[in-house]
Regions:
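Membrane-embedded alpha-helical bundles that constitute the cytochrome b-like, heme-associated redox core
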Residues: 1-266
Length: 266
């Protein structure tokens, strides 16, 4: 994250600096990408250890970075994100919050209450977002978020940005990877491959649990960062809206920091 912020401040980056910035943003998503990779390899019966493939992928990425020209300026055209698409991204995010995310996060906050309370709340909430109309809509909204979000990332990283905008971009990269991986874990891995319910046992990694199992331990940063960054990303979007509507940048920046701090304490 810090490397991406530093590189994003360069006005006229070289080809190597631009590639390094984008690679640093991708590295922010490393915890969720590693989980995604592990799930996919598990369904393929682990043809190679996930750690080996993981190291190989980053070694290739590093080799590509080292081959980049650090003298020639990056040949990219700085183009703005279309306003209608940006508005659609925000509106669809708000729809997801109202239809699904608020209930889903509230459900997960029931973990300290124990399995019985968690499952009882899950059953109630699933009547809302798992019906034949809303569930396909939720999936479509998530895919729209991922597609438009990655398009924004590519456009926005072609231009310099301050640390607050870079944080918004980085959190978006993480969430795009997380959403794709989470939908794969739920719809393909759990419901199709294992044919199990995605309730308490699935969420907590039972019977081994998350802490003591060498595979499940990766789920802790995977889930915690998702919770932190989804709330922080919403705060980042609110910051942009406030600045657009005349709120002072300093105040909007402070409100984003406050939102991120609050998200980190959940």
């Amino acid at each position: 994250m810090l490397a991406a912020m530093s590189l994003s401040g360069i006005d006229r980056p070289t080809a190597a600096q631009l590639r390094a910035k984008r690679m640093a943003l991708l590295a922010v998503a490393a915890p969720t990408l590693f989980t995604f990779l592990g799930v996919v390899l598990y369904m393929l019966h682990d043809p190679v250890p996930d750690t080996w493939l993981w190291v190989a992928c980053w070694a290739i990425a590093l080799a590509l970075l080292l081959q980049s020209d650090n003298d020639a300026p990056a040949r990219v055209a700085v183009r703005l994100v279309p306003v209608p698409l940006r508005v659609a991204h925000g509106v669809s995010a708000l729809a997801l919050v109202m239809i699904f995310l608020a209930l889903h996060i509230a459900n997960h906050l029931m973990f300290p209450a124990g399995e019985g309370s968690y499952d009882a709340v899950t059953k109630v909430f699933r009547r809302v977002y798992r019906n034949d109309i809303l569930q396909p809509l939720v999936v479509a909204l998530f895919l729209f978020q991922v597609g438009t979000g990655l398009f924004f990332v590519w456009r926005l990283t072609a231009a310099p940005s301050d640390r607050f905008r870079t944080f918004q971009i980085a959190s978006g990269v993480y969430l795009a990877a997380y959403m794709l991986g989470h939908m794969d874990s739920v719809f393909i891995f759990a419901r199709t491959y294992l044919r199990i319910d995605t309730g308490w046992d699935f969420a907590t990694g039972d019977p081994a649990g998350m802490i003591k199992d060498p595979w499940n331990i990766r789920l802790l940063p995977h889930y915690w960062l998702a919770m932190f960054l989804v709330l922080s990303h919403l705060a980042s979007g609110a910051r942009v809206i406030m600045i657009t509507h005349g709120v002072g940048k300093a105040l909007a920046d402070r409100l984003l920091v406050a939102g991120a701090v609050a998200a980190g304490h959940l």
